[in-house]
């Protein structure tokens, strides 16, 4: 099974080696056919503290690193 990759934007960088990344997805409502935007936040491990607020990043799913961290920053776009 391959790991999931998601593109998101860093919104908070106040913790050491941790960033909070916001992702946005669009889906269509089944009945009303309206486009719905879904926003989700992920707590992400930033090994070398290389990301800054506003950076667009690719995050990669990994084993649990702490109570809330299950994602790692793969690269900055």
Swiss-Prot record:
Its main location: plastid. One of its GO terms (molecular function) is structural constituent of ribosome. One of its GO terms (biological process) is translation. Keywords: Chloroplast, Plastid, Ribonucleoprotein, Ribosomal protein, RNA-binding, rRNA-binding. One of the primary rRNA binding proteins, it binds specifically to the 5'-end of 16S ribosomal RNA. Part of the 30S ribosomal subunit. This is Small ribosomal subunit protein uS17c. The gene is rps17.
């Amino acid at each position: 099974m391959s790991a999931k990759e998601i593109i998101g934007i860093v919104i908070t960088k106040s913790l050491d080696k941790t960033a909070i990344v916001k992702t946005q997805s669009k889906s269509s409502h089944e009945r009303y056919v309206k486009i719905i935007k879904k926003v989700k936040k992920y707590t992400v491990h930033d090994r070398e503290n290389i990301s800054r607020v506003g950076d667009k990043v690719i995050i990669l799913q990994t084993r649990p690193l702490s109570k809330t961290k299950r994602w790692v920053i793969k690269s900055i776009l």
